Amino acid sequence: RQRQMCIRDRCEPYLTSDYRLMLERPEDLIQGLHVVLSLFDNAKGVIAIEDNKPEAIAKLQYLTDSDPDIEVKVLKTKYPQGAERQVIYVTTGRKINSKMLPADAGCIVDNVQTVLAIYDAVCKTTPSMSRVVTLTGDAMAEPQNYKVKFGMSHAELLEEAGGLKENAKKLISGGPMMGMAMYDLNTPITKTSSSILAMSEDEVEKFEPTNCIR
């Protein structure tokens, strides 16, 4: 069975760090994918991008048009299209049950920043000491993407980014679907810190308490 290496674009709402990197470092991304493919015999690469990112799609399709080992696949924009099992099925047709790992189906799935970190380490001998973090939401003073060193606290990052607006109601580390509410801003940025989402009163869902019955 042919091995497949898939780069997935993040599908969480609000997060744009991987999208910006696809626009700004497409050649490095493709070279990083080739580094991974070189580790296996008869391996093919797939870059899976949702169809709401036409500029990134056009750039990567242009760069891989004559590349026999890499294919750009355009996926429908829906959540959780970028989840590991879903992206393997939609790009390869291979099904993975709850007891299987991607490797059992001959697949590896990584995100954009991981593949770029591989490129930096192998091709530029640069260690992985930072990542791009999305700061966004209606209550963020200056929403944009920041390259942040590991170990910097969330509080320090927010201060560097201009802080929060007065209407900030809730902070989430990560995206709105899989992220965690933040209660301590002194926690450090790590390799898994994808974003800080500052939500206003209008963005926070309110529920009226009801009786718990069947």
Language-model features, listed with the residues they occupy:
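Cysteine-centered iron-sulfur cluster-binding motifs in ferredoxin-type domains/subunits
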Residues: 206-214
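Hydrophobic alpha-helical positions that pack around
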Residues: 43-154, 160-165, 175
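Short, small-residue-biased leader/transition segments that mark boundaries at the very start
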Residues: 2-7
